[in-house]
């Protein structure tokens, strides 16, 4: 085969990128080659070139763990930092953070929750009534309402990461669809984290099981998944792409909490498929649901 490396320097907007006509540019580059596969090349770059293995020896932590926990605590309770908002939905008060980034149909009214487990953990550790009474009940309601209810064709799936309080609807960031990995993240992992602390919450457990069953129904015979499905017609979308994402992990969570063998078997099928199609090839698909699932930060 042929190699055709492409180099860009300087990067626009970064140091050294402002040039005048006639200026000269000097830069160096390194080419590393191996016949041992992408992972060995990756390790070489990480450890031999960038020296990541020495980072802990060079690190001097000055902020103790309890100070970090206090910072999270303050952040959650300070509305000016967390952009906390409550809103009505189907007779319930739901709570989340304002999200002012780009969301389809949003009019600066998108809300979402992140780090669900951290919030419940902090409340469990501190017993702070401001958390247990003023935050968690409304975050719980948000998670319950985010999920498609019984009777809906998408029952068990998260209907969108974001709630638009002006339109009173849940939406995805970009697109009118549901994603199997969205079930893993926003149903199984989020509800699973809450259930670690609220084991007797029957509504949450019922919603969790519905999510696990929905994910199971979407797994293909070879262990993989479609990237997304239309909300209204249930047809697979982005069929030119493979779901090269750890969607199968939702089954691991389901098995841990529900203890049923079918979820473990599904996790193994999914993991085997993921290794064959993603890990062995050094390939992945982005998880943000943006720009046709480009290789984003996730």
Could you say what each language-model-derived stretch is?
Residues 142-286, 293-297:
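Extended amphipathic alpha-helical coiled-coil/heptad-repeat regions
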């Amino acid at each position: 085969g042929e190699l055709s490396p492409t180099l860009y320097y300087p990067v626009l907007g970064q140091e050294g990128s402002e040039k005048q006509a006639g200026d000269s540019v000097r830069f160096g580059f390194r080419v590393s080659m191996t016949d041992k596969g992408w992972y060995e090349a990756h390790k070489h770059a990480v450890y031999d070139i960038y020296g990541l293995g020495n980072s802990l020896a060079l690190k001097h932590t000055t902020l103790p763990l309890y100070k970090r926990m206090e910072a999270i605590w303050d952040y959650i309770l300070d509305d000016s930092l967390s952009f906390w908002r409550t809103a009505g939905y189907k007779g319930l008060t739901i709570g989340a953070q304002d999200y002012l980034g780009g969301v389809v149909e949003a009019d600066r009214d998108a809300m979402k929750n992140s780090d669900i487990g951290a919030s419940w953990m902090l409340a469990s550790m501190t017993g702070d009534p401001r958390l247990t009474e003023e935050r968690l009940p409304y975050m719980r309601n948000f998670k319950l309402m985010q999920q498609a209810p019984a009777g809906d064709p998408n029952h068990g799936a998260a209907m969108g990461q974001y709630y638009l309080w002006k339109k009173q609807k849940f939406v995805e960031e970009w697109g009118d669809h549901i994603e199997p990995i969205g079930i893993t993240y926003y149903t199984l992992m989020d509800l699973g984290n809450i259930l670690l602390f609220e084991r007797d919450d029957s509504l949450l457990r019922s919603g969790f099981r519905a999510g696990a069953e929905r994910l199971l129904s979407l797994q293909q015979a070879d262990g993989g998944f479609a990237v997304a499905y239309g909300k209204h017609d249930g047809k697979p979308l982005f069929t030119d792409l493979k779901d090269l994402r750890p969607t199968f992990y939702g089954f691991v969570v389901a098995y841990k909490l529900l203890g049923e063998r079918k979820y473990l078997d599904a996790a193994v099928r999914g993991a085997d498929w993921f290794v064959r199609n993603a890990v062995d090839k050094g390939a992945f698909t982005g998880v943000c649901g943006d720009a046709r699932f480009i290789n984003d930060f996730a």
